């Protein structure tokens, strides 16, 4: 079996999706996927540099003492720290991209004021449930919860419209909700390395025939 290295810092999830489909449908090789979720590059590059905040790999345990322009920050990268809470993020009303991968988070503050937030990346944290505050985000399109001990997808998320990209790889999820009709805009769904039965995988494919799904 041939293994492909799929994750790079510069790869976008849309690039990954097309690459995954190429391998899955036009090659006899097997694609092993994990953590290949990223923001769309063209949209990311459109964010002015002074609206981007990079605090990746800074050893942060909290955000006390960090100064943010709440009306200006579009993009916030807090990947690979040791954060256990991010309460200060709740006031960043202009935020569209939020990266919190590889921290120590088990909960989020209320994010209901972040009406512009479109993409949130939460992989490799300690979430046992999908944070319910995501229900209150009307612009949300992308959610990455891969590598968390999440065991089920709540009904409110199954009914949430407007979603385009979801990743639940390397979680404890074994089945999806029965009704997935609200995910009609979904473009890609990562369900890699889950303990799903063949029947459940077949049901998901049938329910979402136009979605790029990676099991």
Q: Residues of each region from the PLM?
A:
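Leucine-rich solenoid repeat scaffolds
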Residues: 174-215
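The feature encodes a structural signal of leucine-rich repeats
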Residues: 63-66, 85-89, 107-111, 130-133, ...
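Bacterial signal peptide processing site
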Residues: 37-39
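LRR N-terminal entry segment and analogous cap-like coil->beta motifs
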Residues: 47-104
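Conserved hydrophobic beta-strand positions in leucine-rich repeat
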Residues: 53, 74-78, 98-100, 120-122, ...
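C-terminal motif of bacterial Sec signal peptides marking the signal peptidase cleavage site
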Residues: 33-35
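Leucine-rich repeat
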Residues: 69-72, 89-95, 111-117, 135-140, ...
